[in-house]
Amino acid sequence: MLLVSKLLTLFVYPLSFFFTLVIVSIVLRRRLASRLANALRLLAVAWLYFCATEWGASLLLAPLERGYPAVETDALPLAEAIVVLGGGMTDESRFGLGGDLNAAADRLWHSAALFSAGKAPIMVLSGGAGLGQSTTEAELMLGALRAIGIDGAIELETQSQTTRENAYFTGKLLNAHGITHILLVTSAAHMRRAIPLFQAQGLLVTPAATDHQTPLHVGAIPGWLPTTERLGRSTRALHEWVGYWIYERLGYFEMAAITEN
């Protein structure tokens, strides 16, 4: 099911959608539907261009992040636990020193700062092993935190492979400890989907958003020029919008339990 859902999600990504429309237009052209084929090609090019510009990337991503601004560590309340969602590491490493960090590694550093500041007495690292991975992301995150000197009570949730499972399995762990109030650490764009899933587990959630990707300033490259970085942000935003829509339609924000294999 995980593989199927990820493959289906790929079709909404700008590049995948572009090539899908191009392939459909080629088929239509061979069937003498040239006018429709040309329209699809124009739509494909326009959509890819839009998503690769600052206009498109900001229009798609900013609404996801706007509700979860960066908050100074001192301004966040005390909680019973800090919950960190996986997504910032992979188990690939060229040097045999553990997982490699990726673009979402801010989750790890932000959680380390919160824990060091005493915002909660316990931290929960949530993330199982992805497709083709031999080590769970929770274990990789623990290794990275220990390497930078973060000690103390850290619990691991190693079964989850989706955001929904993050919430469910972490919720079970927290309920066993009698914990109800958490600081949730994940990327700002991910918060819209993650928070209601944890609330469905009966938890009081305070967002501790990080990894904001909407730039404060456009920079040297004009906003109308397409770049791969902007295309990447649009892709991330579409992933979250579609994920939120699917979870909402399936009732995941209201359902506390899932079927365990």
What kind of feature is each model-predicted range?
Residues 1-27:
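Membrane-embedded alpha-helical segments of integral membrane proteins
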Residues 3-8, 56, 60-64, 238-245:
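Hydrophobic alpha-helical segments of integral membrane proteins
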Residues 12-17, 204, 231, 244:
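Alpha-helical transmembrane anchor segments
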Residues 29-37:
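Membrane-interface helix-boundary motifs at transmembrane edges
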Residues 39-54:
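Hydrophobic membrane-insertion alpha-helices, especially the h-region
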Residues 50-228, 234-235:
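A structural signal for short, hydrophobic/glycine-enriched beta-strand patches
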Residues 220-221, 232-261:
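Extracytoplasmic/luminal low-complexity segments enriched in Pro/Gly and acidic/polar residues
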